[in-house]
Amino acid sequence: MGIGTRTVRRLGLRVALTILGLLAPALVSGVAAGAALEPIVNVSPPVVSGLAQVGERVRTTPGDWTPAGLTFTYRWLRDGSPIAGATSRSYKIRVEDLGSALSAEVTATDATDQTGTATSGPTRPVRRGTLDVLQRPSISGVARYDHRLSADPGRWAPKVKNVRYQWLRSGDPIAGATKASYLLAPEDLGERVTVEVTARRDGYLPGTARAKRTKAVDHRVPLRRMVSYHVETRGKITADLATFKRLAQETYDDARGWRSAGMGFKRVAKGGAFTLVLAQASWVPRFSSVCSAEWSCRVGRFVIINQTRWLHASPAWNAAGRSLRDYRNMVVNHETGHWLGHGHLGCPGPGKLAPVMMQQSKGTDGCKLNPWPLRSELWAHPSGKLSQAPADHDARVWVD
């Protein structure tokens, strides 16, 4: 055999031998024929970082491996089982993961398609996520008694469809006020109102946010006229006069009363546009022969409250189980209504609220007892001069 030469060259998977001028090809997996493969070894495992709660994104490192030059693929596991489609280096936690532990499985591959696999340690069990307020709730509407306010729930991330409302008066929950709108009540007068929105979404903790408070709630309409009056008594008075004065003024100030017609009332020491009288029953007829010792009356500038009725209401009122305080509201509103120019009204229909200008002390003809003016009764005298009783009623006597 003649002298020969041997050359070795690595070209991908091909090793060429030349002996005595002859070419003999050979295929070897990844290395020259006879050479051993270098094993893939995980030196340190993958590490998952991020908050383990719904809606958050967790990420994994590939870990440390030998040899160098490896490529990596990822798969996320829920309690050790693969999560369909979760094959990125990061993973956004879903509602289905709630209560489960997550881990990341990393597969390393070399140039010869040799692989190695390592898995991170588990996260703690996934907790419920938190809802973020992108735009706080807001309130629209006029902050006046008997006006309706409406709530906008604001914007949340992620988006929510389930929201609940609780209206608050000066920070305290208003009983039963749990809808998206709220009709301002007499109790709201002078108070600031807001609404608290609670947002809910599956897999998330409830989120709460409050709207900016309204300004102090005002009366239904602006003050159009302030009327002054003073208080007198007639006959033997056994009722507490200070209480009478206080409760009468409370009736005048109440948002449900004549104040909703734009009328304000101010008590003065003497004089004024009219006189509110607390009279012993036997004294009432002295104002006019038309007046009765049984009922209250209005004669000219005198708005006369019968002391017996003030202390005990009327048989019809008591038979209906209504309160003495409501009767007092009614009788002051009724007699003052005469001074304002209102006459008597009848029942508008069975089961409906009685007008305050109906003679409710005597009965209601099927209407419901009512101490406050109806909306239809809240009118001002055409002259607009409400500092005194309209002239065409000055001489009239009303018995109630």
Where are these regions (language model features)?
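N-terminal export and membrane-targeting signals
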Residues: M1-G21
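Extracellular/periplasmic catalytic domains that process cell-envelope and extracellular macromolecules
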Residues: D97-G99, D188, P222-R224, V268-G271, ...
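Fold-level signature of zinc-dependent metallopeptidase catalytic domains
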Residues: R220-F244
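Metzincin-family zinc-dependent endopeptidase catalytic domain
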Residues: T243-M330
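Structured segments of extracytoplasmic/periplasmic soluble domains
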Residues: E250-R259, W339, G343, Q360-G363
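Metalloprotease/metallohydrolase-associated module, dominated by Zn2+-dependent proteases
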Residues: A293-W295, V299, V303-I304, L311-A313, ...
